Amino acid sequence: MGKIIGIDLGTTNSCVAVLDGGKARVLENAEGDRTTPSIIAYTDDETIVGSPAKRQAVTNPTNTFFAIKRLIGRRFKDDEVQRDVNIMPFKIIAADNGDAWVESRGNKMAPPQVSAEILKKMKKTAEDFLGEEVTEAVITVPAYFNDSQRQATKDAGRIAGLDVKRIINEPTAAALAYGIDKKQGDNIVAVYDLGGGTFDISIIEIDSNDGDQTFEVLATNGDTHLGGEDFDNRLINYLADEFKKEQGLDLRKDPLAMQRLKEAAEKAKIELSSTNHTEVNLPYITADATGPKHLVIKITRAKLESLVEDLIIRTLEPLKVALADADLSVTDINEVILVGGQTRMPKVQEAVTNFFGKEPRKDVNPDEAVAVGAAIQAGVLSGDVKDVLLLDVTPLSLGIETMGSVMTKLIEKNTTIPTKAQQVFSTADDNQSAVTIHVLQGERKQASANKSLGQFNLDGIEPAQRGQPQIEVMFDIDADGILHVSATDKKTGKKQNITIKASSGLSEEEVAQMVRDAEAHADEDKKFEELVQSRNQADGLVHATKKQVEEAGDALPSEDKEKIQAAMDAVDTAIKGNDKEAIEKATQELIEASAKLMEIAQAKSQAQGGDNADAGKQANATADDVVDAEFEEVKDDKK
């Protein structure tokens, strides 16, 4: 059986880890980095992922996608999506089913399809390290992700060619990474996870006893649309407003300028975590009739903190709710762990310290802990890690819509998963022959105020007065936090059961098509790589041949020179095209045309070898005249 890898599919950065010699190891990508920017760019002939995509974003802003995780499993009309529509340089559109999709070069794409490109890079990184094909993975998601978002993440894995063995919550993964070596005693840990696009708080009890470890999530809460991207946007808007005041020009109308501004704002935010002031300097940011304009604005740490203060305060309310749900107070928390790049901001650390009354731990890498935890969970599933039990929870309550548009809960939030629950319902009207089961997720009493996960019908109910038929509804949540629902007419035994797929989301056919597309692109990518390799080899041969022609000088007959030049011209022409076979044919013809050149080079080399041999003989003759002296070691006479 091959290795199961652990992937942290992040909003801003992604990371992959694998168990190596019993320890989780974070892997370096092809660029030599341990984390990969979650950025995907589409050009005319290729898909670019990670740092190379980030580098070209300024020149290709409308086809470079970042923070796609904020759209995964969401509807276009969602308030959170509408906020992003107005600030993202790329196009966010409504799919036929109402989902939020993106568009590049006329192609409409679902977020799982785009996210799959990042997962493919993580898969390739692991394969390069392991030297074998990887087909299975554990992928992390924010603890507060709903059912639709979890399903969409699994779809992304499938499109990338991965069998997702488990979806694990990010704070739980971080707790695994922290606690796996803590072998004795009980600890109650608060994991504060403020990443690029999401915020989670999980209260986790780690029980270590005689080598056995149990990680039990007591409560979780959060906000799936609050993270470092929002901090960046506050700074971007401030810089754009300041520039408009000074120059009278609105940079928000210029995608190219906004992409440069985004990069500069992110850099300034990071710098202000270690310094008290910095300067954003962007020459030639835009131009008007009077000429080019430059943006030069000084930012202090205090200014940044004032811009994002309310965002930091927003993270504190879920902390209070999670503690209340776990029936704990801040004094019950033994350790606080910070996860996610945004927790490097001193003001965030200060807020967490003040809330819990203790300093967070500094020995957990906020960028890598989640991937490490995913790799450990992968080890648990494969049997490589023993004596570890992980008890996670469902973040939101689950139920169905009942008479009066009320949500009746079957499974309360923070229930340990996997779990089952059932309840008997009846009909609302006389002689009702069918019932609609409308499945909801959320905490509100009013059905319409909660997230609709989908609905299905149970028909064939025997006619009877209202309230008499007995319909048993069963909810079954698996270890991934994904819901399966069944409804049974207890009198007839007729049953209808489904895995909940939201009214949004990708159908099986769509996912299958995207898998086929990804496989086709894999072939295309391989062909493109081979084409580039052939071009590079041909170009290198032309360069080397030119040099040899110059070195040969008059020793090369003019007839051969003309033949070689014609062959080099043919290679140059072939390189400009996309026909690999034509390039290889032209390359071979150049090698054959250069036969005389090779003879001259070999003759010259042999002549040089003869000269060197003569020089060697002379050196030996000189050496023969040297008389060896006899030296004695003189030792100090120490008395």
Swiss-Prot record:
Keywords from the UniProt entry: ATP-binding, Chaperone, Nucleotide-binding, Phosphoprotein, Stress response
Domain of life: Bacteria
Induction: By stress conditions e.g. heat shock.
GO MF annotation list: ATP binding; ATP-dependent protein folding chaperone; unfolded protein binding
Modified residues (Phosphothreonine): 198
Pfam families cross-referenced by the UniProt entry: HSP70
Region (Disordered): 602-639
Biased composition (Acidic residues): 625-639
Described function: Acts as a chaperone.
PANTHER family: HEAT SHOCK PROTEIN 70KDA
Family membership: Belongs to the heat shock protein 70 family.
Protein name as it appears in the record: Chaperone protein DnaK
Origin species: Shewanella baltica (strain OS195)
Classification of source organism: Bacteria, Pseudomonadati, Pseudomonadota, Gammaproteobacteria, Alteromonadales
